[in-house]
């Protein structure tokens, strides 16, 4: 079809010389035929060379598939039991059940052989056969335990053949006993117990000598013995065809007969048959236990793995062909005997096969051939297994067998010699158990490798899958229970004990095992399914930032206890501006911290992060830690090293005005536990030392963690913590004190949204939760108990607060003692709030550079009562009033309102000048009214603390986060409010909080101590606080009644808390309390950052080890 494009006006068709008329033609010229010159068919194929003649094969002189696997497997499976016990088993079970038993046994063998073939073709197989394959697949615990069991099975198999060979030997060459027919071939050997033991010993020693010469000699002997055995088996159906029927000495032979076949078709269990050792009637279980060893020699070829040229090829091929050959032989023998020998003859004669044979000496030679080779292979295979176990050094005490194969062969020979004291049937049952146990574990190994989907499990043998391996393992277990359930249970118990022994006493191995692949598969699967949305299953998942393990050793170990089955990550930051150059250093640090983890014996992951700065490194570690639902929910950071900071910066703001401190009489002494001394070199000693964090960086870390909604824990003084060990016990128990201090405010109404009371109930409960978790750790449970300490400002609140906390602890199922104290019992509080001068010097030294404190002191000095004289001049009164106004305004700017009480104390004697003082009383009343006015200060976004007078004492309106340090230092961070009432959501499921704090009606009182959260309507009206007895009462009452703990600036609050805790927790081992987080942007101002850190330092000074906690998530629930 011709394009219509050229029919548009203004277009023209290009000339034919430039363009082809075919518009769809390719822009490139057609490829010339001559350019395709490579012909793959002409490449000569590499000629296949047998491994026996391959000059590059270092094992070319070793055994191949036929002589190394097929012959040993055939000779070992075609056991002496075929000649000694097939007549007995066929007479009891009949042809159908015997063939069924044969099919069951060979099904187990075939499925196990498929597993052996798969594992052996997945890599290089060295000496040890089944042990080597299992140990490298399932690990040293499984390999060592099953290796010992398999070793004993091989030993008992050799012993069974050594004992079993005596019967045909005496039948053919022994002296005839009285009443018994003469020997078949000649009377040469005397009978008797010790004679028989001597014959077996001599035969065993001859077999040991052949095995001692070497595998090549065993191979040559095996080829000859295999031909003899094949001729012997071939003679059985041949005799059934050519020999005429006869009856001789109670033994009858009918030849091939349908009647005989019909009579022998079904089972007929009897007792007392020849070859039976049971006093009662035979059972299927006992017969299976005797029959199975006749088919269980499939590991004979695999046991020769160290002597094979190419084990991965020879083991599957030789074993499968050996199984097929032996199954045909057994089936032919069963049908030949079943259709030609009457059942009575099968009951009465053990050597019935030789008795009805046309060439009896051939049967005797076959019996000798299979027995001798089974003994040789059994001892040699067992010796190889023992040598392999010894070389792997997984069981202590076997090192001697690793030096020379001769030692393991001699030891195997001695153990086999001990088996000669037992009976064939008993040995056969034990061999069944050991072989079946080996089958179970071999199939299990292949099954686990298959389901683990390990990329490197790619066996060249493809005729297996997870179903064949699972069925093989299951059938093997069922077969064990069929034979003897008690023996199977005992063997399983022995396996478990061996497993545990190897697990705890064997040195670590670098083989790797399938458990790693399975763990990976399951972890990936369940990590994708893991959710953290249900509070019921909350657990601490800790990220601990550590710089130097020497200074944080106790904290590292403490967090390991605190995690209580949760996630634990050791985080470290390496600051680098040039990542490629520092990559090797990062790898070195990663390895070093992993060694630190192992030295500390903690269950933790290691996360080493990097960044151009410490802050970015912290962010990277936090964001990159964990996987899926296993992400850190608590970040632990050590407290800022303020002492080192002051040494390096002596002109810090805090030291410029630092005065001589006056110690309180009852302070907490320093812990008797010295700093942690680690006298051994640590792996991190060789790593690069990071620059010390500065105060602004430390505050920014806390801000960032809060911004990323992480629960934060600040650890202080943990170098003095004495961590209990497993052997410690203590009575009475030591104390862990909990101070769940409230930080609450009020969110102002905005539009349609009503005002709401806010509390730090999440932090409150997390403190209780972590402490409760810690005392469930066995080391802490035996040595420590919990104590919850609360404080209120008024004595009448104590009872109510105690009841609420006990109720909360009962709901949370936490066992702890509850103490509630009143702040007016403590000196620092009385000095700051009530003007008590008892520790004024100490408080003044701590608050010397605090403007709020200066103004308060000056206001109190101005309002200090003076003696009233009737001659007082009005000018003095006016001057005093003016000065009071001035300082009243100064204090008022700080958000503090005072209510002055003009009532005289009742115990004062009235002066005659009372009327003259009326004007002064009026003026002071004016001052009181002025002080009662509330003022605003910028401290937090839309947050206010509400006084109990009903007026807003501090209107917290933040318009700019970057307020100056003087303003920030005035912010109250704690509250003395009583514990909020809580409501339990009874139908909760754990997805949402089931314990909810209730905001109760706000009651006003006249003392301004608290916001009223948690106060019920039933509470009586508060009583005004009494004046300190140290205050002068000569004139007007000058107590500033509305000043309370909630009104104090942060520094003063921290000082009060320090006094409370030093008095209450002087003998405690550990303290948990609330962490006030800095406002966002605090780190941008050095003085504000330093003020925040110094406030915390004032609080924690002289205290036992403390952990300050801030939570942003609910961690407790009452849901089932």
Curated annotation (Swiss-Prot):
Chain ranges on the Cytoplasmic side, renumbered to this chain: 1-62, 107-145, 215-221, 305-317, 382-393, 452-462, 507-1120
One GO cellular component term: vacuolar membrane
Subcellular localization(s) per the UniProt record: Vacuole membrane
Positions bearing Phosphoserine: 34, 654, 915, 918
Bilayer disposition of the protein: Multi-pass membrane protein
Annotated region described as Disordered, given as residue ranges: 1-21
Transmembrane segments: 63-83, 86-106, 146-166, 194-214, 222-242, 284-304, 318-338, 361-381, 394-414, 431-451, 463-482, 488-506
Disruption phenotype: Affects vacuolar morphology and decreases survival upon hyperosmotic stress.
GO molecular function: potassium:chloride symporter activity
UniProt family annotation: Belongs to the SLC12A transporter family.
Function: Catalyzes the coordinated symport of chloride with potassium ions across the vacuolar membrane. Involved in vacuolar osmoregulation.
Record-given protein name: Vacuolar cation-chloride cotransporter 1
Species this protein is from: Saccharomyces cerevisiae (strain ATCC 204508 / S288c) (Baker's yeast)
Lineage: Eukaryota, Fungi, Dikarya, Ascomycota, Saccharomycotina
